[in-house]
């Protein structure tokens, strides 16, 4: 068990990354970009040191980061006790990505994966990518893991009778939780899962209310107009059932 005095963690955004092809240049570029985008902060916080690949990156860019021995000591002594990250999607990478079809991603654009479906905002849905990332993170750090955000932003329709039918959200959550359970069977020490988010709120990436994540609907539009009345979506009852079964009942 985790000691009661061990409460330090980190929170980061993490997307699984795959090379676009088996061409060595694509594989190497994917490795480098995954280091820069996915591992830099967690390596600092969970290994207690600035990774060598970033030292080289700064040097080649002509950047001098003034890191004192005192700073390095703080990093070494302040290693986080568990891993926390958000997962929404995956992306592919290439040494020639500027010549490939792009899609929207979490705050950035990414190369589109032809094998995956996308949300209305271009985020590519990849439940297997969650299992993949959990295995990667546990193999790298050997620390307990919490998934702190996972969900689907979508346009939800409020029906005349007050109901909101969102089977697409249920499918997204069920498929990701199923893959999380596979990661647990793989031996990954997953301690918790938190979907994003329980109630509709303004999207941080697009600043829209119409991009809804919640299992509770809020009557407000992109311009702040509405009654703010809250209504349960179909996904509310489904997620309630999922929680009560500790993720064992994923039936739609």
Regions found by a protein language model. Give the residues of each.
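Active-site region of glycoside hydrolase catalytic domains
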Residues: 4, 8-252
């Amino acid at each position: 068990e985790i000691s009661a005095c061990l409460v330090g963690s980190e929170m980061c955004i993490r997307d699984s990354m795959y090379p676009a092809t088996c061409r060595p240049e694509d594989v190497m570029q994917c490795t480098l970009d995954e280091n820069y985008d996915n591992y830099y902060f967690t390596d600092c916080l969970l290994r207690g040191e600035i990774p060598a690949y970033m030292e080289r990156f700064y040097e080649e860019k002509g950047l001098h980061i003034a890191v004192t021995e005192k700073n390095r000591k703080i990093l070494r002594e302040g290693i986080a006790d568990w891993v926390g990250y958000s997962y929404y999607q995956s992306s592919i990478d290439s040494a020639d990505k500027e010549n490939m079809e792009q899609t929207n991603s979490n705050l950035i654009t990414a190369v589109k994966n032809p094998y995956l479906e996308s949300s209305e905002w271009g985020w590519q849905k990849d439940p297997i990518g969650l299992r993949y990332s959990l295995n990667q993170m546990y193999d790298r750090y050997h620390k307990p893991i919490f998934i702190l955000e996972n969900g689907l932003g979508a346009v939800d329709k409020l029906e005349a009778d007050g109901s909101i039918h969102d089977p697409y959200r249920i499918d997204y959550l069920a498929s990701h939780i199923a893959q999380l359970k596979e990661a647990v069977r793989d031996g990954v020490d997953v301690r918790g899962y938190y979907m994003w988010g329980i109630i509709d709120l303004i999207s941080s990436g697009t600043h829209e209310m119409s991009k809804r994540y919640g299992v509770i609907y809020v009557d407000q539009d992109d311009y702040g107009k509405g009654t703010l009345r809250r209504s349960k979506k179909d996904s509310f009852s489904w997620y309630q059932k999922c929680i009560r079964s500790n993720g064992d009942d994923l039936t739609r």
